[in-house]
Amino acid sequence: MYAAMPDERFPIPAVDISKVNRRFYRQLVDDPTGERPGTIVVDTRRFYLYLIQPRGKAMRYGVGLGRAGFEWSGRGVIQWKQEWPTWTPPAEMIAREPELEKYSAENGGMAPGLNNPLGARALYIFQDGEDTLYRLHGTPEYWTIGKAVSSGCVRLMNQDIIDLYKRVSTPSPIIVRSGALTSV
């Protein structure tokens, strides 16, 4: 499941599974959300992303999340998907971390590749027709799954974002819940 992916545009190394808690491995589970099939639900309390399947099932993935003050929650739509995306940090991030200026929109962003923070795939979250600037995306830093350390996006292991990317069509509803699954 987390083997090397040598046929990718940028060959992806295997995940050292000793650095990832087994509870975050991708697996088919009973749907705890009650949402319609095709809906993505992020449980920020447990660090899980669910892709709701038919017949009361869900594909569950472990995720990494934004640190306090950088998270997003609410309802939106996956409006766009990209393989090996270019990363362009938002102006607010560049203001906090001026060394990222070289990756600004004006400078063309960071080229796709294994060191790109968006990893192998990105799914773009829109709300009310506008890009939220939040993404579901891969990460080469798989040891951060289950932690809140990023600038707000939902990160998955590259192998998992590739699996999710194949399963999700656009547009698809997404719900990012900041509390227990029984509340929105």
Predicted regions, residues:
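N-terminal pre-domains immediately preceding structured catalytic cores
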Residues: M1-V184
